[in-house]
UniProtKB/Swiss-Prot annotation:
It comes from Arabidopsis thaliana. PANTHER family: LOG FAMILY PROTEIN YJL055W. Keywords: Cytokinin biosynthesis, Cytoplasm, Hydrolase, Nucleus. It catalyses: N(6)-(dimethylallyl)adenosine 5'-phosphate + H2O = N(6)-dimethylallyladenine + D-ribose 5-phosphate; 9-ribosyl-trans-zeatin 5'-phosphate + H2O = trans-zeatin + D-ribose 5-phosphate. Expressed in roots and shoots. Detected in the epidermis of the root elongation zone, cotyledon and leaves, in trichomes and pollen. This is Cytokinin riboside 5'-monophosphate phosphoribohydrolase LOG7. Optimum pH is 6.5. GO terms for cellular component: cytosol; nucleus. The keyword Calcium does not apply. The gene is LOG7. Disruption phenotype: No visible phenotype under normal growth conditions; due to the redundancy with other LOG proteins. Belongs to the LOG family. InterPro entries: LOG, LOG_fam.
Amino acid sequence: MEETKSRFKRICVFCGSSSGKKPSYQEAAIQLGNELVERRIDLVYGGGSVGLMGLVSQAVHHGGRHVLGVIPKTLMPREITGETIGEVKAVADMHQRKAEMARQADAFIALPGGYGTLEELLEVITWAQLGIHRKPVGLLNVDGYYNSLLTFIDKAVDEGFISPMARRIIVSAPNAKELVRQLEEYEPEFDEITSKLVWDEVDRISYVPGSEVATAT
C-alpha cells in the first residue's frame, strides 16, 4: 500500500459498537482504517473491539499504525471481547473519555452510529463553534446515513439557530478518501466574539505534542 504524508498525526473516529444492518457500513469502517494507514495517520477511538469500532481499529492496527482506545472501566466488559487492539486507556467516565479522545486527536470523523456517536460528534462540533478547538470535524456519510441529520442542521440554519459559519464546521463526504482529503484542506473560521473567548480547557483539548495542526491560542 502506497503511503501519503498527512498534516494529521492522529484522527479520532466516533462510531457504533454495533455493525449496523448494511454491509456498506462495515466496508466503510475498514476503508477508513485503510485510508488512515495509507496516509500514515494513527487512530484514537472509543476502545471497543466490537461493531464498527472493532473493524476500524483492526484495519489501522493490522496496517502498522498506532491505535489508542479510550474507554470507561464500566464499559470494558461490554465493548471489549477477546484480544485488545493496540493501546487501551481506561478512564473513569464518559466525560473523561471524550476529553481524552479530543485532546489526543488532530481531527474527528464520525462513521455511522447511534446515540453515543451522535453525542460525541455534536459535542466536538459545539467545541469548535465556541473556539475551544480548531480541529476539522467530518461525517462519513455512508449511503446517505447522515442525510437526515444534515437536513435538520440546514433547517436550524434557515430558522436562525445555527449560523452559516457554524454550519461550515461540518465536512461530509460519502467515502473515506474524499472525506480525509477535505479534512486536510479544511481551514477554521471564527467570528469576532468567539475569537476573543478564553477557555480553561483549551490547552488540554487542543494541544497534542508533535502535532502540525493549528490549535487555539
